Amino acid sequence: MKDMGEDRPGIGHSTNLVGLPTDLLASAWFNQAAPEIHIAGVREMNRSLFEMLAEAPDLESAGEAFYKYMIAMFGLDPEQQDHRPGQGGAVRRFHASYLRLLKGWGYDTNAKEGAVLKGWVESRFGLFPTFHREPITKFASKAWITYIEEKMTSRFHNNSIYVQLDLMYEFCQWALARFAAPGESALLLYRGVNDFTEHQMIERIDNRQVVVRMNNLVSFSSDRGVADCFGDTILETRVPVSKIVFFNTLLTSHPLKGEGEYLVIGGDYLVKASYL
C-alpha cells in the first residue's frame, strides 16, 4: 500500500483478493478489456450453494435459492434482525445483513452503510474510495477519517458482513453469466451527474469522451431515462460484467429494484458525456 504519510491517496492497496494488480484492475484498459475475475475461495468454500444454483431453471428460482441459503448461513430471519424484546424480556441481537446495506445505499450512498460497502470493495478489490460525503484528497483529511470510522461501525460487523458481500458478488457473477447476460463481457450503462465533484477527470479524449476516475463503488442504471433523473449530464460507458456487484433483477425483492440500479466497482472509465 502507498505510504500513509503521503498527502494524496493512490488508486489503492498493492494487494487484493482477486489476483490482479490493483493498478491494472482500476485502469481504463481493464474496463475496456473486461476480463473475468473472482474473489479467491468463495465458490470453493460454498460448493453446496453453487450446486443448488445449477439446478435453478430461471433467475427467479436462483434468487430464491440464494436468499434461503443466506438465511440459513447467517441467521437473517426477520425475527433475528430487530430489537424488540424476546421471551423473558431479552433483546434480540441485530444481525447485520447484506440487504440492510443495500437498503441504506438506496437512501444515501454516503451513509454508514455506504461506507461499509466501500470498505468491502477496498478490502476485496484493493480500491480506495475517492469520495465519502466529500472528496477524499488525502489520508489525513476529515473525509478519510470519517470514512474509516463509518466503515468500521460495529453495528454492521457482527455477522461476517464482508463474507455475505463476497457471496452476493459471486452469486451476481454467476447469475449474469447464466441468465442475465450470457456471453457478454460488458454492459452499456448510464450515470446521471450534475457536476464532477465525485469524479476525478483523468484525461480528455475529445469534446465528448473523457476518462474519469469513479468512486470505488458507484451506482449506474441500464435505463438512460432513469439516469436523467439524477443529473443533467449523462455519463455513458461499457461496464465490465466482472465489475457488477448487484443488479436490479438479481433478487425478486430488494431495496434497489425501483431504479433499475446496478452497483459497479469503480476505477478509471472511458465515458461519453452528453447533456440534457
UniProtKB/Swiss-Prot annotation:
GO biological process: nitrogen fixation
Transmembrane feature ranges: none
A single MF term (Gene Ontology): NAD+-dinitrogen-reductase ADP-D-ribosyltransferase activity
EC number: 2.4.2.37
Coiled-coil portions: none
UniProt key word Transmembrane helix: no
Catalytic activity: L-arginyl-[dinitrogen reductase] + NAD(+) = N(omega)-alpha-(ADP-D-ribosyl)-L-arginyl-[dinitrogen reductase] + nicotinamide + H(+)
Stated pH dependence: Optimum pH is 7.0.
Alphabetical keyword list: Glycosyltransferase, NAD, Nitrogen fixation, Nucleotidyltransferase, Transferase
The keyword Oxidoreductase belongs to this UniProt entry's keyword annotation: no
Quaternary assembly: Monomer.
Reported function: Involved in the regulation of the nitrogen fixation activity by the reversible ADP-ribosylation of the dinitrogenase reductase component of the nitrogenase enzyme complex. The ADP-ribosyltransferase (DraT) transfers the ADP-ribose group from NAD to dinitrogenase reductase. The ADP-ribose group is removed through the action of the ADP-ribosylglycohydrolase (DraG).
Protein name, as recorded: NAD(+)--dinitrogen-reductase ADP-D-ribosyltransferase
Organism: Rhodospirillum rubrum
